[in-house]
């Protein structure tokens, strides 16, 4: 689960991290009052969407020369002008896809005199089984380019969970970021705070980009992105309360009601598979034969007929889907249950696109018999390779 920047900063502030003063607004009428709460004279107006690249993004409704999703303002009138342009419009960034995201809230923040922009994040390093700091002296809007072109500029420091952030860890991090004086002292206070917040709130990612050194030598968290482990949310009602469902895909929200692992993608072949590994292999082979998957959908090992029906409905709710591939290897999952669920869904929602079904495993013959005797236009496949070729061909021919 993700939250907005202003929410992430409020959470970090509660742990003692240095963040700028700011006010979130939801309508243009709130702009002037919000700006008056800040010291000024420099203000920053920030679009609040669950995607990065906001500064370089463009609004669909504005011209190509219009400013992006993060703007500087040097007066309250300029704040109001930016708010009027940004709020309610659609911001397209390198992370939103061409559809973009509607900006329904803005964060007006006190400006800062920036001397240096650094990058910092915390994540779970699965290679070592520990939380790791990832830092770079090259912070800001071009961090993806830095990671691609000069990966040696990105340093990782793993933290022993028993010891926590040690003096040696702090020395390694501050040295990697070339910090000294007050900035180094601030960092030595800040980094344990960030680690504590990450662990206590069961985060999957905490990204501060940029982490700045101001001209007065002090440090500040200028931007913050947080993602939380969905499996641990039951322990954090305060975090769940921050969820903004308008930023999430409606199909993913519906899937979560049935404990289905669903991720919307940009292709046109819907997939329903049992098992994450098989689901990824299914997506790979669709791409191998020249098409693109419309989703990742793992129905799990203990799916019921009702769960399968719900999964099918979620797939067909996507107007981009031009064909569906059902790929089931029945172990715990029984092929006849899948077959009954698919047929029930087809009868319920109708079938206007090609459907290929590949079944293997427990009760496979019964499952195939149910499908073959249904009288519905369902294409049967012998194996995964055969299934992928058939669905790609059917979609191209449609």
Swiss-Prot record:
Binds 1 Mg(2+) ion per subunit. Substrate binds at residues 274, 331-333. It catalyses: succinate + ATP + CoA = succinyl-CoA + ADP + phosphate; GTP + succinate + CoA = succinyl-CoA + GDP + phosphate. ATP binds at residues 46, 53-55, 109, 112, 117. Pathway: Carbohydrate metabolism; tricarboxylic acid cycle; succinate from succinyl-CoA (ligase route): step 1/1. Keywords: ATP-binding, Ligase, Magnesium, Metal-binding, Nucleotide-binding, Tricarboxylic acid cycle. Heterotetramer of two alpha and two beta subunits. This is Succinate--CoA ligase [ADP-forming] subunit beta. It comes from Allorhizobium ampelinum (strain ATCC BAA-846 / DSM 112012 / S4) (Agrobacterium vitis (strain S4)). The lineage of its organism: Bacteria, Pseudomonadati, Pseudomonadota, Alphaproteobacteria, Hyphomicrobiales.
């Amino acid at each position: 689960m993700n939250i907005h920047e202003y929410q992430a900063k409020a959470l970090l502030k509660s742990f003692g991290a240095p963040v700028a003063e700011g006010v979130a607004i939801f309508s243009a009428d709130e702009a002037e009052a919000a700006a008056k709460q800040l010291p000024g004279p420099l203000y920053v107006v920030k679009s609040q969407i669950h995607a990065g690249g906001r500064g370089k993004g463009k609004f669909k409704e504005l011209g190509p020369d219009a400013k992006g999703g993060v703007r500087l303002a040097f007066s309250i009138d300029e704040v109001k002008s930016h708010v009027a342009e940004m709020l309610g419009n659609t911001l397209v960034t390198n992370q939103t896809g061409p559809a973009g995201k509607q900006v329904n809230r803005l964060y007006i923040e006190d400006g800062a005199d920036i001397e240096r922009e650094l990058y910092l994040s915390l994540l779970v390093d699965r290679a070592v089984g520990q939380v790791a700091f990832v830092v770079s002296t090259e912070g800001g809007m071009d961090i993806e380019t830095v990671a691609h072109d000069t990966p040696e500029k990105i340093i990782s420091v793993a933290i022993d969970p028993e010891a926590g952030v040690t003096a040696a860890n702090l020395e390694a991090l501050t040295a990697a970021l070339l910090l000294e004086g007050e900035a180094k002292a601030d960092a030595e206070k800040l980094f344990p705070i960030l680690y504590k917040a990450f662990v206590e709130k069961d985060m999957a990612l905490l990204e501060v980009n940029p982490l700045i050194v101001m001209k007065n030598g002090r440090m500040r968290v200028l931007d913050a992105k947080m993602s939380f482990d969905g499996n641990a949310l039951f322990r954090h009602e305060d975090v769940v309360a921050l969820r903004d469902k308008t930023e999430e895909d409606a199909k993913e929200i519906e899937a979560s009601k049935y404990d289905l692992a669903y991720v919307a993608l940009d292709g046109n072949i819907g997939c329903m598979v049992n098992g994450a590994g098989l689901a990824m292999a299914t997506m790979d082979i669709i791409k191998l034969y020249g098409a693109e998957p419309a989703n990742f959908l793992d129905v799990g090992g203990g799916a019921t007929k009702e769960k399968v029906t719900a999964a099918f409905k979620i797939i067909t709710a996507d107007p981009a889907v031009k064909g569906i591939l059902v790929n089931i290897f029945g172990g715990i999952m029984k092929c006849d249950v899948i077959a009954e669920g698919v047929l029930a869904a087809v009868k319920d929602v109708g079938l206007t696109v090609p459907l290929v079904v590949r079944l293997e495993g427990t009760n496979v013959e019964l499952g195939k018999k149910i499908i073959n005797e249904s009288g519905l236009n369902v294409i049967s496949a012998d194996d995964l390779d055969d299934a992928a070729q058939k669905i790609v061909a059917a979609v191209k021919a449609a």
